[in-house]
Swiss-Prot record:
UniProt family annotation: Belongs to the amidase family. GatA subfamily.
UniProt GO BP: translation
Enzyme Commission code: 6.3.5.7
Domain of life: Bacteria
InterPro entries registered for this protein in UniProt: Amidase, Amidase_CS, Amidase_dom, AS_sf, GatA
Name assigned to this protein: Glutamyl-tRNA(Gln) amidotransferase subunit A
GO cellular component, one term: glutamyl-tRNA(Gln) amidotransferase complex
GO molecular function, one term: ATP binding
NCBIfam families hit by this protein: gatA
Active site, renumbered: K79 (charge relay system), S154 (charge relay system), S178 (acyl-ester intermediate)
Cross-referenced HAMAP family: GatA
Binding partners and assembly: Heterotrimer of A, B and C subunits.
Catalytic activity: L-glutamyl-tRNA(Gln) + L-glutamine + ATP + H2O = L-glutaminyl-tRNA(Gln) + L-glutamate + ADP + phosphate + H(+)
Length: 487
């Protein structure tokens, strides 16, 4: 039995029937990680010893005849920008290379309470700034479907670990597409929840009004189970929403007949690879065959999403990253003779090129001479983008689009052209600006690589996104395919 091919709910059934132990599952995952890490490089830090201790506790619970929850004993991975008590948390940056937090992020606490077993911390673009993991301060992660291609970013390690069978599920963060884009590139499920639905306490901030934590899973049911564990109000996060949260599995398997589905004309224009377009059109036809009513809609202001995002996100980043000064924690340059020089050298030596670029962009946008012309104007257009979605959702239940305009690109293809790199998130940025949920599922394949279908919903309507995604998954079976890694 190849345990690494199983989903969380399949492993749960095996545990309940005592056909396998949690320790066996963890050892299988550890062997898989050891065999694949030289090739995939998804992890920054491994925590297998701690995972085995956690698994032993789950086995003892089962042996005592106690009931276990759907995630108990299930191996997971955590993106390395979420604090983990006693485990190094680097943001894949030299400036935090030796930072060990004294507490867990709320999502980590919740998953531990749910009995999930952490196998390690995954690689990312430094401070979550990037779309390929090529900006990691340590190494680039490879796409399990083709190791010469990127896994996407910034949560590339989290997506690759699930696609390769190194983790059953993982957590990522999404500021402009950093869950959905790598999910599309790696052929897994990736959900960016509504802003405020999942606590950001313990997430190392990039852009605080845009950041959101969400899951990567191999199928939609697993995604629902992880959301049940991590969603909910948290008093430690002032932006956490005090609303009623549903059972995210409750609508799975229910029909979508009569649903009104919108296709934004702005998302189906120039720039999309013809083969990707073909896969998406076929996916839309499948949704129609399932009984949904599909019609064109318009999101006119989303054409400004890219410049709006690259004014707001760097502005917030320049403020958030001001704390890395070499004084309180993190890297400190030892070659400085005075305090000001120490600040300058610490940041010059500790940050990578993309992080420096975005700090400079943000500082420029916030400077007194340009604040009104750039930053404030971007905030106003952000409101117009949100209004576009509000108006569309008066007529439609969900909106469908490609997740990305192309399949995963090869290493080095876009490193010398930042704008081309930024354009890989062109279909995902608006969802963050509007604060609404977006889900990417595998729609099929083009050029032998996965293609993502993005499903966008109303605020706090994640359960219905999962419902339509589950219906599509059941109709196509695309989620069941795994890359052949020769192990």
């Amino acid at each position: 039995m190849k345990l690494y091919t199983k989903t969380a709910h399949e492993l749960h059934d095996l545990l309940v029937r005592k056909e396998v132990s949690a320790t066996e599952i963890v050892k299988t995952q550890a062997d898989r990680m050891q065999a694949l890490e030289p090739k995939i490089r998804a992890f920054v830090t491994l925590t297998v010893d701690k995972a085995l201790e956690q698994a032993a506790r789950v086995d003892a619970k089962i042996a005592a005849g106690e009931a276990i929850g759907p995630l108990e004993g299930i191996p997971m991975a955590i993106k390395d920008n979420m604090c983990t008590d006693g485990v190094r948390t680097t943001c894949s940056s030299k400036i935090l290379n030796n930072f060990v937090p004294p507490y867990d992020a709320t999502v980590v606490t919740k998953l531990k309470e749910a009995g999930a077993v952490m196998m390690g911390k995954t690689n990312l673009d430094e401070f979550a700034m990037g779309s390929s993991t090529e900006n990691s301060g340590f190494f680039a992660t490879c796409n399990p479907w083709d190791i010469e291609r990127v896994p996407g970013g910034s949560s590339g390690g989290s997506a690759a670990s699930v696609a390769a069978g190194q983790a059953v599920f993982s957590l990522g963060s999404d500021t402009g597409g950093s869950i959905r884009q790598p999910a599309a590139f790696c052929g897994v499920v990736g959900l960016k929840p509504t802003y405020g639905a999942v606590s950001r306490f313990g997430l190392i901030a990039f852009a605080s009004s845009l950041d959101q934590i969400g899951p990567f899973t191999r199928d939609v049911r697993d995604c629902a189970h992880v959301m049940n564990a991590i969603a909910g109000h948290d008093a430690k996060d002032s932006t956490s929403a005090p609303v009623d949260y549903p059972d995210y599995t409750s609508l799975l398997g229910k029909p979508i007949k009569g649903w009104r589905v919108g296709l934004p004309k702005e998302y189906f224009g120039d720039g999309m690879d013809p083969e990707v377009k073909e896969v998406i059109e076929k996916a839309v036809k499948t949704i129609e065959d399932l009984g949904a009513e599909v019609a064109e809609c318009s999101l006119p202001h989303t054409e400004y999403a890219l410049p709006v995002y690259y004014l707001i996100a760097p502005a917030e980043a320049s403020s958030n990253l001001a704390r890395y000064d070499g004084v309180r924690y993190g890297y400190r340059s030892e070659s400085a003779d005075d305090l000001i020089t120490m600040f300058k050298k610490t940041r010059a030596e500790g940050f990578g090129d993309e992080v420096k670029r975005r700090i400079m962009l943000g500082t420029y946008a916030l400077s007194s001479g340009y604040y009104d012309a750039y930053y404030l104007k971007a905030l106003k257009v952000r409101t117009l983008i949100k209004n576009d979605f509000d108006q569309a959702f008066e007529k439609f239940d969900v909106i469908l689009s490609p997740t990305t305009p192309t399949v995963a690109f090869k290493f080095g293809d876009r490193t010398d052209n930042p704008l081309q790199m930024y354009l890989s998130d062109i279909y995902t940025l608006s969802v963050n600006l509007a604060g609404i949920p977006g889900l990417s599922i595998n729609a099929g394949f083009a050029k032998g690589m996965p293609v993502g279908l993005q499903i966008i919903g109303k605020p706090f309507d994640e359960a219905r996104l999962l419902q339509i995604a589950y219906a599509y998954e059941e109709a196509t079976g695309c989620h069941s395919k795994m890359p052949d890694l020769g192990v």
